[in-house]
């Protein structure tokens, strides 16, 4: 569950910025998880285009995702590639969670790895083509170009790294040149001062000897420190060995094999605890430290810009950690009602407390062991100084000490008796005080009863209160009088001090006035210069920002053009290889024969079509005249048919040019018809 929460939190950060909750993420199905994984890959690498997984075959989706994972060098937990492919194609939740858990946190690193891996990977092809001579030659050329790409990419990164801190390097070079000039001036002045000395050679010889002696002194002090460290180490080992020897001698003198065995078992237990618990932790810490230092040294950080970039990254990571902690606290608050979660948190807290107590006890044990070793070493040292006999005090010293204690014994007894008398007196006084207090309480009760009988209850308390108030008032008045006297004395002292101080400060005040006038003039000049400086800085910053924007745009354009150049170069090379493949070899002969046959067949077809075209051109005019004759015949026959039926016909629809002319009575006789161009009898 922790990995899922971490994945959701990481997906909410740039460059992904997926706004989803833990519940919505866990409710996603296999297809939705595959779509999310594909979108994450497309965000990391623009070469991995966004694809709708629903419209894609599962095997094709699995091959595409696994191919990208190979490029970014992902190592699955499943050793069998076929099983891993099946799990990805099926959208197995655990497998996809592991991939997301590995990919999402290191998007920036994988982006660079995907860019480089895209150009360093070979295209997929069937196995039977791998041993083709042309394919093998092409692979060798691709390998050579990949090596060239690696070198160019490294040089490009180095140039980009150097170009980041150009201004910082310029400033550093300028400061070094100024420092060089100052040092040169100092050297020249020193040479001039030395040349003026009458016995310059003797001074030079003395200075040289002094420098040699100083270097020798430094070397000797270093050697002394080294020898002292070795001596302390040897003394510590000697004390440990002496303590061990003393323990063994004690065990041997006691004659108890069980005691000796118990001691050895305890030592073995302590050593085993150190080997199994303490030393692995220290080794792990040192390995992590060494790895961090190695990475820092390998990164080649040598400029202030790099340090600032790392500081910004550290700040961003701290902010992310803070956000994650706040989100975790919010989630913990939201889960307060979950009984199982509360039990789990309680168990985790108990385990944490137990581990902390265990570490504290281990540290305490180590401190006690070190203290024991130090005390043992001190005891051994005292024994060694005492001649190795094991006795700290001699017999004469014991006798002197005994006589001193014997002479002080009467004083001790006398003071002890006085202390007993004082304690008895204190006891009697305390008992008397208790009796008087009880009697006072009884008397106060009697007084209260009498006051109540007389109808003046509370009189005693009021009188006591008034007495206390009067005492407090008198005390306050006395304090007020003393305070007023003290205040008047203090005011007089302050006035005297002020007058005295005024006399002392009079010349300084006059000087201060002139200084204030000078300050006002300098402040006006400063404001004027500051305004001019601000204007210059604003202009410079505007120009700098414009140049930076232009530089970033040009860098982006250069990067895009480099990518296009590499892509077009690869395509051109592939096209050249295809042309070479087509124009040489047995395959080219077969293709040439095939296309020559097709060309010959096309020529024969063209010749036949041309003959057909010529034939059609020859018969075209004859066909048109026959069509006109047939049209005229049809009109003539239609006209004869109409005349036979006795129908007057407008000849214009048959191509005639005029109408019919008749007598006044009309009729068929004496009528004339315009028959157009047809050969028609006149009736």
From Swiss-Prot:
Subcellular locations according to the entry: Cell projection, Cilium
InterPro entries per the UniProt record, alphabetical: IFT81 (IPR029600), IFT81_CH (IPR041146), IFT81_N_sf (IPR043016)
Stored Pfam families: IFT81_CH
Protein name per its UniProtKB record: Intraflagellar transport protein 81
Keyword annotations of the record: Cell projection, Cilium, Cilium biogenesis/degradation, Coiled coil
Function per UniProt: Component of the intraflagellar transport (IFT) complex B: together with IFT74, forms a tubulin-binding module that specifically mediates transport of tubulin within the cilium. Binds tubulin via its CH (calponin-homology)-like region. Required for ciliogenesis.
GO cellular component: apical part of cell; intraciliary transport particle B; motile cilium
Organism: Chlamydomonas reinhardtii
Coiled-coil zones: 134-387, 587-618
Family named by the database record: Belongs to the IFT81 family.
PANTHER family (UniProt xref): INTRAFLAGELLAR TRANSPORT PROTEIN 81 HOMOLOG
Highest taxon of source: Eukaryota
Domain remark in the UniProt entry: The CH (calponin-homology)-like region shows high similarity to a CH (calponin-homology) domain and mediates binding to the globular domain of tubulin.
Subunit structure: Component of the IFT complex B, the core composed of IFT25, IFT27, IFT46, IFT52, IFT74, IFT81 and IFT88 as well as associated subunits IFT20, IFT57, IFT80 and IFT172. Interacts with IFT81; the interaction is direct: within the IFT complex B, IFT74 and IFT81 mediate the transport of tubulin within the cilium. Interacts with tubulin; interaction is direct.
The UniProt record lists the keyword Coiled coil: yes
Keyword Coiled coil recorded: yes
Region (CH (calponin-homology)-like region): 1-122
GO BP term, pick one: intraciliary transport involved in cilium assembly
GO molecular function: tubulin binding
């Amino acid at each position: 569950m922790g990995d899922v929460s971490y994945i959701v939190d990481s997906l909410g950060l740039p460059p992904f910025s997926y706004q989803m909750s833990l519940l919505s993420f866990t409710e996603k199905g296999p297809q939705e998880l595959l779509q999310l994984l594909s979108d994450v890959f497309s965000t990391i690498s623009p070469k991995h285009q966004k694809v709708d997984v629903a419209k894609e075959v599962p095997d094709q989706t699995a091959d595409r995702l696994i191919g990208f994972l190979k490029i970014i060098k992902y190592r699955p937990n499943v050793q069998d590639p076929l099983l891993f492919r099946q799990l990805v194609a099926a959208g197995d939740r655990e497998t996809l969670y592991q991939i997301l858990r590995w990919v999402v946190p290191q998007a920036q690193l994988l982006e660079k790895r995907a860019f480089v891996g895209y150009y360093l990977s070979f295209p997929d092809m069937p196995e039977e083509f791998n041993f083709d001579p042309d394919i093998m030659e092409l692979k060798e050329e691709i390998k050579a170009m990949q090596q060239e790409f690696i070198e160019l990419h490294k040089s490009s990164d180095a140039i980009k790294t150097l170009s980041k801190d150009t201004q910082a390097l310029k400033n550093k070079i300028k400061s070094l040149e100024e420092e060089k000039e100052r040092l040169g001036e100092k050297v020249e002045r020193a040479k001039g001062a030395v040349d003026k000395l009458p016995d310059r050679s003797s001074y030079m010889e003395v200075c040289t000897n002094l420098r040699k002696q100083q270097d020798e002194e430094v070397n000797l002090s270093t050697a002394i420190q080294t020898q002292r460290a070795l001596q302390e180490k040897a003394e510590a080992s000697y004390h440990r060995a002496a303590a061990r020897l003393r323990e063994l001698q004690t065990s041997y003198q006691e004659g108890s094999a069980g005691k000796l065995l118990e001691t050895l078992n305890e030592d073995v237990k302590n050593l085993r605890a150190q080997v199994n618990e303490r030393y692995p932790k220290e080794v792990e810490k040192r390995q992590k430290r060494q790895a961090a230092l190695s990475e820092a040294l390998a990164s080649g950080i040598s400029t202030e810009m790099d340090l600032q970039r790392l500081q910004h990254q550290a700040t961003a990571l701290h902010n992310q950690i803070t956000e994650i902690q706040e989100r975790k606290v919010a989630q913990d608050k939201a889960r307060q009602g979950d009984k199982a979660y509360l039990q789990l948190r309680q168990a985790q807290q108990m385990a944490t407390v137990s581990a902390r107590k265990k570490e504290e006890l281990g540290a305490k044990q180590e401190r006690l062991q070190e203290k024991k070793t130090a005390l043992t070493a001190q005891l051994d040292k005292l024994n060694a100084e005492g001649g190795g006999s094991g006795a700290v005090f001699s017999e004469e010293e014991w006798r002197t000490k005994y006589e001193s204690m014997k002479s002080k014994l009467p004083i001790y007894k006398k003071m002890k008796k006085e202390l007993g008398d004082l304690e008895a007196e204190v006891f009697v006084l305390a008992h008397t005080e208790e009796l008087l207090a009880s009697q006072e309480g009884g008397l106060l009760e009697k007084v209260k009863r009498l006051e109540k009988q007389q109808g003046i209850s509370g009189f005693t308390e009021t009188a006591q209160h008034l007495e206390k108030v009067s005492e407090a008032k008198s005390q306050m008045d006395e304090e007020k009088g003393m305070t007023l006297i003290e205040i008047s004395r203090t005011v007089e002292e302050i006035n005297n001090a002020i007058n005295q101080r005024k006399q002392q400060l009079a010349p300084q005040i006059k000087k201060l006035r002139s200084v204030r006038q000078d300050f006002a003039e300098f402040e006006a000049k400063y404001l004027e210069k500051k305004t001019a400086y601000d204007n210059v800085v604003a202009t410079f910053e505007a120009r700098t920002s414009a140049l930076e924007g232009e530089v970033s745009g040009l860098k982006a354009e250069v990067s895009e053009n480099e990518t296009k150049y590499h892509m077009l170069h690869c395509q051109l090379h592939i096209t050249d290889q295809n042309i070479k493949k087509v124009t040489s070899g047995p395959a080219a002969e077969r293709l040439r024969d095939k296309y020559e046959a097709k060309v010959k067949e096309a020529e024969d077809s063209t010749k036949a079509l041309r003959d057909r075209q010529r034939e059609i051109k020859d018969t075209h005019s004859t066909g048109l005249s026959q069509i006109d004759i047939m049209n005229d015949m049809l009109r003539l026959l239609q006209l004869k048919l109409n005349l036979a039926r006795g129908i007057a016909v407008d000849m214009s629809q048959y191509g005639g040019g005029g109408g019919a002319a008749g007598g006044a009575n009309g009729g068929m006789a004496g009528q004339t018809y315009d028959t157009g161009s047809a050969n028609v009898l006149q009736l």
